[in-house]
């Protein structure tokens, strides 16, 4: 595949970054990810707006405008579409690191002040298809989400160590499960790239935005709830709420909306998967994007 690296479109296996890049050394970088539906990029503007907010939070100047990133992203996708099966779609990622420190630039004197990458990869449709048939098993590990008074969860940065540690802990318990982190107060926060919704008595609730990354798919889902006349509230939620839920689902760029089978082995009260509210939102999401991504996943079973 072709990637964009610092002003050039190059083959993926030729895109190299200095070993002393601060994104590699310190996790000093930011990124955002969108996806295609039927080979068309979805909500790129919203993703780039979030990307820009994270760059400002990190005081990181990419040397590119968001209009530049839009053009580059579209070009990367278009150059790689011939490599993609007509039934597949891409994840598309924009990534910026702080590049090299002044001390390290002696070995790479021409390296720009920021490292800028835009690349794409096929979505793991086959690996995730079972989640749409059976639902996802979630486990909350002992690792907690970094508190907002330390680092804002609203910034999408390279620092995913708490998610990685959570994934390792959960994988040791159940390789089929995904981790979902609690915050330092014991409230539900987020998974590695996913937000959570709880359904109780046909009313929905999701953790407050100030404690989680404000997912674009999360916002799309809230808008779909309003369109369908479903009440949705942003509030603190803990495991008591999850264990008493009728339905649970997660949202993310790649998953869109995916039902949860269990959390810490506890099953929601509605035994069908997906439950009726989740199913109605999946249908509305499919209609919104004008592409049946739900069947796209199920066809890989």
Specify the residue positions occupied by each region the protein language model found.
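Secondary-structure junction motif
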Residues: 217-218
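Glycine- and Gly-Pro-enriched alpha-helical subdomains that act as flexible
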Residues: 179-180, 187-209, 214
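Conserved alpha/beta cores of soluble small-molecule-handling proteins
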Residues: 1-180, 184-187, 213, 223-301
């Amino acid at each position: 595949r072709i990637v964009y690296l610092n002003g050039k479109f190059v083959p993926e296996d030729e895109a190299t970054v200095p070993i002393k890049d601060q994104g590699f050394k310190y996790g000093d970088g930011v990124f955002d990810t969108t996806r295609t539906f039927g080979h068309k990029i979805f909500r790129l503007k919203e993703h780039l707006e979030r990307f820009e907010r994270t760059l400002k939070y990190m005081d990181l100047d990419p040397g590119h405008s968001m209009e530049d990133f839009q053009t580059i992203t579209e070009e990367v996708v278009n150059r790689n579409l011939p490599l993609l099966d007509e039934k597949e779609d891409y994840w598309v990622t924009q990534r910026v690191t702080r590049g090299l420190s002044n001390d390290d630039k002696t070995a790479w004197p021409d390296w720009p002040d920021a490292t800028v990458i835009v690349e794409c990869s096929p979505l793991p449709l086959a690996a995730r298809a079972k989640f749409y048939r059976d639902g996802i098993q979630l486990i909350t590990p002992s690792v907690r989400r970094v508190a907002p008074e330390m680092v804002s969860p609203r910034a999408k940065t390279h620092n995913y160590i708490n998610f990685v540690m959570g994934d390792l802990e959960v994988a040791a318990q159940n390789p089929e499960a995904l981790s979902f982190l609690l915050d330092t107060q014991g409230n539900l926060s987020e998974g590695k790239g996913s937000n959570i919704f709880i359904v109780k008595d046909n009313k929905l609730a999701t953790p407050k935005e100030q404690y989680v990354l404000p997912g674009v798919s999360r916002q799309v889902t809230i808008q779909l709830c309003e369109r369908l006349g479903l009440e949705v509230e942003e509030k603190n939620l803990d495991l008591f709420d999850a264990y008493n839920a009728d339905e649970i689902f997660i949202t993310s760029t790649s998953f869109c909306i995916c039902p949860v089978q269990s959390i810490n082995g506890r099953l929601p009260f509605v035994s069908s998967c997906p439950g009726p509210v989740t199913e109605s939102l999946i249908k509305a999401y499919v209609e919104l994007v004008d592409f049946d991504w739900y069947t796209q996943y199920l066809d890989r079973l």
